[in-house]
Amino acid sequence: MEPAFGEVNQLGGVFVNGRPLPNAIRLRIVELAQLGIRPCDISRQLRVSHGCVSKILARYNETGSILPGAIGGSKPRVTTPTVVKHIRTYKQRDPGIFAWEIRDRLLADGVCDKYNVPSVSSISRILRNKIGNLAQQGHYDSYKQHQPAPQPALPYNHIYSYPSPITAAAAKVPTPPGVPAIPGSVALPRTWPSSHSVTDILGIRSITDQGVSDSSPYHSPKVEEWSSLGRNNFPAAAPHAVNGLEKGALEQEAKYGQAPNGLPAVSSFVSASSMAPYPTPAQVSPYMTYSAAPSGYVAGHGWQHAGSTPLSPHNCDIPASLAFKGMQAAREGSHSVTASAL
């Protein structure tokens, strides 16, 4: 008849997964082991897995008990206040001590035994969370005691510490008798200027500075005075000077100056009325007829030789007859316009 619950292992024994072995079987395993029977033989005889037999015997040799561990129970608390106190003492005596050294000292001093001594990770967590904060608080308190009193805040802008011109002027210029002095704490904070404004580029004071400086007996440049500094107030040049230079010196240099060969002198120039207008280039019609061969056409300059014709500017005859009717008409039209303009 098959059992109502449980499973059958490889040896034919019945076990319930997740449940401890009955105490009677546990006691029998220990008795057979004390008789000198090997664990593998005990496993075959009692039909219990070899791992279960080895685990029960190891726990009995370590603790002397055959009872199973707490099912679903929590591990007993090992970081008691007494242990934490001793760990703090060790850390204060030797700040560079390691967690494994603290664990060895707890065992050596008899604070803990091998069953309830905290692990290295637990000691590190205690040092980081509990003792570390206390050590930092103690260092902060000692630093705060030696720290001098904070200086009073300056009456400047809290964002940009820009010096106040009124305070600086009051520190340099003595106050004349009979005039009440402006205290430094009453000085208005100067706003942060814009680096692209005309006022800052020209160095003109702001409206706030002007309002305060109007009450002082000393003269300060106003905005109106800057407008008077125009070009019309500068002394005009003398009539006998050209561009700020003496006219006589220029004439003397022009008189003795010699120009290169083939070019007119500097002082001698031709009036505009006696010069002919520069001939405009002729507009060539895009539909002009061209009857000559490509090799017969010679490109010439705008100027013409004395003995040349319009069709042969280099005084050479073109064998083929060219029909430049559009060009000739445009050239005649430009000459007529030039003559009428003169």
UniProtKB/Swiss-Prot annotation:
Keyword match Transcription regulation: yes
Residue ranges of the annotated DNA-binding region, renumbered to this chain: 4-130
GO (cellular component) term, any one: nucleoplasm
GO molecular function ontology, one term from the record: DNA-binding transcription activator activity, RNA polymerase II-specific
SUPFAM superfamilies recorded: Homeodomain-like
Tissue: In the embryo, expressed in pharyngeal pouches and derivatives, developing vertebral column, tail, head and limbs.
Signal peptide feature range: none
SMART domains membership: PAX
Subcellular location(s) of the protein: Nucleus
Phenotype caused by lack of the gene: Death shortly after birth. Mice lack thymus, parathyroid glands, ultimobranchial bodies and teeth. They show craniofacial and visceral malformations as well as malformations of their distal limbs.
Keywords assigned by UniProt, alphabetized: Developmental protein, DNA-binding, Nucleus, Paired box, Transcription, Transcription regulation
InterPro entries given in the database record: Homeodomain-like_sf (IPR009057), PAIRED_DNA-bd_dom (IPR043182), Paired_dom (IPR001523), PAX_fam (IPR043565), WH-like_DNA-bd_sf (IPR036388)
This protein's name: Paired box protein Pax-9
This protein's encoding gene: Pax9
